[in-house]
């Protein structure tokens, strides 16, 4: 059983003692009896005496997503379904024709390197020796390339939504000097290269043009929205996370390349967050009942697995295990391992990428540096405003928002859940502000990068803490040490042209892009009408 504690989950909510969504069964006289024989249970029909053995009830991570009790604490109950023991068990019983992949996030690589005092290249070699040389995987890849594909999709989605929102305002004859008169703002999507003018052919993209767009790569945040703030679902980005994009790429390619069944390709993902297990279990991320990502492990679980297998990563750097990676099992157009120069936040750089892309595509600004003002509200909430190079008018406003304290404020800000009196006060302030500068909308965001963990993905719940018990290091200082490795200088090998080439090789028909790269969300209804269920808590 993987080691988890309440302290690992800053948003932990104690699960209820009973299911909060019980089946509604009308009381009626039973026509069957139940007979117990040893460890087996049988149902006996009273009229005919016919006997049938009852199966064992089970619950999966996917069932957990349909429950509206807790938010992200569910993995403390069900995480063993994707534990390292289950991974090892699968490897022991795997089919001979099976292809095994490992995908690795750059946050995990940086965390493991910092924990063991190794370089990124050294920890990468250790992981390859363990998974390929010892456990028999065919290939290990990082998610940098799939992340670049996702970022490009997110940026195009934002530009489409921004243009649709602007068109909607114009149809309603809403006067705005920046939108209607600004010479840099295009009057149609056809003026923008790389932005789709017809979103109906890109059904996965946020077609309703609801701003702000809220990033969706954090499954803890997605669970929170689906279970407690479903009114925000239209704002969520429809683009898959890098984990799920990578899983889809690998399985699609292997099935086609080797003419094999989808369930003969097995994919393990190494991620900084336990919630990624829940994401991998969503029905939306499976094809014909086969998941794109079969299992997810975090650095905390990897360390436990190393101990179980009696593997010392530091010793491996001195006495390496020979191994041979199967190059035939990797798409030739997908960069296997890239020590990229990481740009933007240590949570994937969504906001920074979208801001730069939108500045160029929407306003013709190549270098946003001189025209972006930053307002650091606190360590985990930072606002960015792009202004016109000549007039200093506000063009777009974005933010990074980490941790549930800031998320709750964001929710109130986006859909105004405050009291009427407070709303009136804010309205008066906004009216006065607009009277002084009619082009400013300080309370409006156009795009927000949202992560449930304080500090973002680099500080995910599955990341390893500072290793020494002899010296006390604050969580913030440790996170900065890991970030230093994450941002270690590298070479940008995945650019826009490389992303376009990968998409062409993977998705032959551009109209199918939404099927491969986009997803959907659903409101999870709560049952708060039963006072007995509400009172019966641990």
Swiss-Prot record:
Binding site residues for [4Fe-4S] cluster 2: 218, 273, 453, 457
Binding site for [4Fe-4S] cluster 1: 19, 64, 67, 70
Gene3D superfamilies: 3.30.70.20, 3.40.50.1780, Fe-only Hydrogenase (Larger Subunit), Chain L, domain 3
Cell compartments where the protein resides: Cytoplasm; Nucleus
GO molecular function, one term: ferredoxin hydrogenase activity
Disulfide-linked positions: none
InterPro entries, per database record: Cytosolic_Fe-S_CAF, Fe_hydrogenase, Fe_hydrogenase_lsu_C
One GO-annotated biological process of the protein: iron-sulfur cluster assembly
One GO term describing the cellular component: cytosolic [4Fe-4S] assembly targeting complex
Cross-referenced PANTHER family: NITRATE, FORMATE, IRON DEHYDROGENASE
Family statement: Belongs to the NARF family.
Known function: Component of the cytosolic Fe/S protein assembly machinery. Required for maturation of extramitochondrial Fe/S proteins. May play a role in the transfer of pre-assembled Fe/S clusters to target apoproteins.
Protein name: Cytosolic Fe-S cluster assembly factor NAR1 homolog
